[in-house]
Amino acid sequence: MYVNDEGILTSEFTLTDRHQGPPGHAHGGASAAILDEVMGLVVWAAGHKVLAANININYRKPLPLHQPLLAEARITEVAERKIISEGKIILPDSTVAVEGSGVYVIASRFFEKAIMNGANS
């Protein structure tokens, strides 16, 4: 995973049999989890401590198992207490298979309190 100079986070991955939904293809929940992860991570990489408030996923094509796939995410809006990001999963032929957007709320106090109470240690 890396974030380029334009703020786009990119991650290459391959789904396996344990991610299967329909025969030979990924379960939709696996796709949603991947997009939630990259859409949230691009916000964290920009220095914001956030929690997901809403994610929206649009399935365009099924994701094949055992093939290299690409996930990308970028921040599209920064407001006072919320940040919106968008993500997509791209097939080997460059077709966008799954798209999503996420609304993340800034929750710095939540994380500061958790750290002071010994969480994540």
Regions found by a protein language model. Name each.
Residues 7-9, 51, 69, 83, ...:
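Hydrophobic core residues within well-ordered beta-strands of beta-rich domains
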Residues 10-34:
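A conserved, well-ordered hydrophobic junction motif at loop->secondary-structure transitions
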Residues 13-15, 59, 106:
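Hydrophobic residues in beta-strands and at strand termini
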Residues 2, 58-60, 72-76, 90:
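Conserved positions in beta-strands of structured domains
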Residues 37-70:
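Hydrophobic beta-strand-centered segment that forms part of the acyl-chain substrate-binding groove
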Residues 1-12, 16-17, 120-121:
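Non-catalytic linker/capping segments at the edges of enzyme domains
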Residues 63-65, 76-121:
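HotDog/MaoC-like acyl-thioester-processing domains
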